[in-house]
Amino acid sequence: MKILLPILICFFSINIHAQNFGGGLILGLSTSQVSGDHLGGFNKAGLLVGGFIDLQLSKTLKGQMEMTFIQKGSNNPNMNENSYSDISLSYVGIPLLLKYQQSSTIAIEGGIETAFLISASDNDVYGKISANSTREFNTVDISIFIGMNYSINSKLILNSRISNSIIPIRDHASGATFKLNKGQYNSVLSFALHYII
């Protein structure tokens, strides 16, 4: 977590009212799954909250940096019927992205996110499973994403985004690897409102 302090200082020290800079707040919902956990579907709902700053690079192109708290993982809606545990993960994420303004109301985006794990647990029907009985999660999750923005008005933007880890969040239970499949990966579909300050 020590690495977050200088990033936080830089993030919030930028004057968002300077020429070509903007910024705002983020509030939304994440839905996620973890590949390789025997559970399918974006069944895990979580909180997505944070802030952003952006820089107008050209008439149609913006660079943007965000800092968010996001919940990821997987959910087993049939836990009483099978023995598969699900996963709860919380991260502080730093997405870096480019936004292309396709029209007055639509923008498309793509980028990379580095997320730092702040809490993790495997869960069964009785609650959290002891950390001594589970495999350890990696402390950093790196993912790539694409998304779309719809401008509701001059202050409010609806953002939808899909992302996938490019490095495993932890090894498979067996420790095996399969070519590009090196372990378990986060997949996230998120929906958020961006309020421009």
Which residues are covered by each model-predicted region?
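Residues that define the transmembrane beta-barrel architecture of outer-membrane proteins
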Residues: 21, 41-47, 88-92, 138-144, ...
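Repeated loop/turn-to-beta-strand initiation elements of outer-membrane beta-barrel proteins
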Residues: 21, 60-63, 106-108, 154-160
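Transmembrane beta-strands of outer-membrane beta-barrel pores
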Residues: 29-33, 69-73, 114-118, 162-168, ...
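Outer-membrane beta-barrel "beta-signal"
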Residues: 22, 150-157, 183-197
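Flexible, solvent-exposed loop segments that connect beta-strands
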Residues: 34-41, 71-90, 118-139, 168-184
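Bacterial Sec-dependent N-terminal signal peptides
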Residues: 1-26, 193, 197
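Membrane-embedded beta-strand positions of outer-membrane beta-barrel proteins
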Residues: 25-27, 65, 96, 110, ...
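Outer-membrane beta-barrel strand-turn architecture
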Residues: 55-59, 100-104, 152-154, 197
